[in-house]
Amino acid sequence: NGTCAWLRPDGKTQVTVEYQNDHGAMVPIRVHTILISTQHDETVTNDEIAADLKEHVIKPVVPENYLDEKTIFHLNPSGRFVIGGPHGDAGLTGRKIIIDTYGGWGAHGGGAFSGKDPTKVDRSGAYIVRQAAKSIVASGLARRCIVQVSYAIGVPEPLSVFVDTYGTGKIPDREILKIVKETFDFRPGMISINLDLKRGGNGRFLKTAAYGHFGREDPDFTWEVVKPLKWEKA
């Protein structure tokens, strides 16, 4: 947004977080390490880069209570980073499917999103299970959850739908699965309709090319909208 005029487009961030396993739910305790490598112009010093990154990037993003005197900061640890992008590297990777989703914390089926319209379950299937899992947690059915779905080409109904709450469910997983199947339609055509994925054409997905597909507050990210799930609380 122009706050750091020396910033350039290329870069990478990585945050290492320590968690505590609380009966299946993973609770963040502290940030162990923050790595930021960012391209910059020729006028700025490494000390200025480090100071700006702490003030304008880390401070607004990482809650203060997760940082302590033992938190390690690697800010442009390789030194000068003036030349970036395809000018600086040959053989760049394709779209990073793990960064697009859950950063290695959640499971991934292996299919990339980029270049695919909502008729491809690599994209739409990932979106509907995101909404389902998020709704399970938001409804108080579990503190942690994964929803898995599998398909065969040319077969509208999914081959399988699977729910695992890692022992955090308030009711058995099989009962949660029943609620999920009653609430969500996992057929690709119905996913597009129910999540309104064709609104605005495929250009709508340009926003997903950076900053990930999940955890975003944007009206176009319809899969982030929680659906209320009805269940009998003990």
Swiss-Prot record:
Sites binding ATP sit at D10, G11, K12, S78, G79, R80, F81, D89, R95, K96, A112, K116, K120
Q: What does the UniProt cofactor note say?
A: Binds 2 divalent ions per subunit. The metal ions interact primarily with the substrate. Can utilize magnesium, manganese or cobalt (in vitro). Binds 1 potassium ion per subunit. The potassium ion interacts primarily with the substrate.
Pathway of this protein? Answer: Amino-acid biosynthesis; S-adenosyl-L-methionine biosynthesis; S-adenosyl-L-methionine from L-methionine: step 1/1
Name of the gene this protein is made from: SMS-1
Name one process (GO BP) from the record: S-adenosylmethionine biosynthetic process
Query: In which tissues has expression of this protein been reported?
Result: Mainly in floral buds and roots.
Q: Which UniProt keywords apply?
A: ATP-binding, Cobalt, Cytoplasm, Magnesium, Metal-binding, Nucleotide-binding, One-carbon metabolism, Potassium, Transferase
* Disulfide partners: none
SUPFAM superfamilies documented for this protein: S-adenosylmethionine synthetase
Q: What residues bind L-methionine, as annotated? A: D89, K120
Question: Would you name any one GO CC term?
Answer: cytoplasm
E.C. code:
2.5.1.6
Q: What does this protein do?
A: Catalyzes the formation of S-adenosylmethionine from methionine and ATP. The reaction comprises two steps that are both catalyzed by the same enzyme: formation of S-adenosylmethionine (AdoMet) and triphosphate, and subsequent hydrolysis of the triphosphate.
Keyword Nucleotide-binding assigned to the entry: answer is yes
Q: Where in or outside the cell?
A: Cytoplasm
Protein name as catalogued:
S-adenosylmethionine synthase 1
Q: Which family does it belong to?
A: Belongs to the AdoMet synthase family.
* Expression induction or repression: By fungal elicitor.
| First-tier enzyme category under EC | transferase
Entry's Gene Ontology molecular function annotations: ATP binding; metal ion binding; methionine adenosyltransferase activity
**Cofactor entry:** Mn(2+); Mg(2+); Co(2+); K(+)
